[in-house]
From Swiss-Prot:
Sites annotated Transition state stabilizer: 21
Listed Gene3D superfamilies: HUPs (3.40.50.620)
Catalysis performed (reactions): (R)-4'-phosphopantetheine + ATP + H(+) = 3'-dephospho-CoA + diphosphate
Name of this protein: Phosphopantetheine adenylyltransferase
UniProt gene name: coaD
Record GO biological process: coenzyme A biosynthetic process
HAMAP family: PPAT_bact
Function: Reversibly transfers an adenylyl group from ATP to 4'-phosphopantetheine, yielding dephospho-CoA (dPCoA) and pyrophosphate.
Keyword vocabulary terms for this entry: ATP-binding, Coenzyme A biosynthesis, Cytoplasm, Magnesium, Nucleotide-binding, Nucleotidyltransferase, Transferase
């Protein structure tokens, strides 16, 4: 790691991590010298998986793909976390126009808080643009196959989650 290296943060709840997230991660790695995947301990959002498991799933996914990135959980303001990690850029994925409105507002707030940290938006690839963690959890809850959206390891975690919820 060089002092002049560009560090990027790709934040999210990753509840669970999907092929859409992995697509953005692969592409983001080409834009920065070091990528940090920030797993948010989001107190305002109920998550199916705890932070430790979401972090572990993300680590397993990137390791399995040979991606060189760090996975770090964080709580609080994203820009504060980015500053602590010496990041100069936040990378966000956009699935559809509906994502843009929210993400644009957040990037403006982040800029007002720390103008030295830029936000880059990466549009989702055509084959991942409609994948969402929420849809994946719902499909899995209904007992359907989610292999088009998540890896086998994540599928197994979803199966375990549903067994626990069903008292099995």
């Amino acid at each position: 790691m060089n002092i002049n290296d560009k560090i990027g943060i790709y934040p999210g709840t990753f509840d669970p991590i999907t092929f859409g997230h992995l697509d953005i991660i692969k592409r983001a790695c080409k834009l920065v010298d070091k990528l940090i995947i920030g797993v948010a301990e989001n107190v305002n959002k109920h998550t199916a998986f705890d932070t430790k498991l979401r972090t572990s799933m993300a680590e397993n996914e990137i390791k399995g793909l040979g991606i060189d990135a760090d996975v770090i959980s964080f709580n609080g303001l994203l820009v504060k976390f980015a500053k602590e990690q010496n990041a100069s850029v936040i990378i966000r994925g956009l699935r559809a126009v509906s994502d843009f409105d929210y993400e644009f507002q957040m990037s403006w707030v982040n800029y007002k808080l720390l103008p030295e940290i830029e936000t880059i938006f990466l549009p989702a690839s055509e084959d991942t643009q409609f994948i969402s963690s929420g849809f994946v959890k719902e499909i899995a809850r209904l007992g359907e196959d989610v292999s088009k959206f998540v890896s086998k390891g994540v599928q197994n975690e979803l199966i375990n989650l549903n067994r626990i919820k069903n008292g099995e």
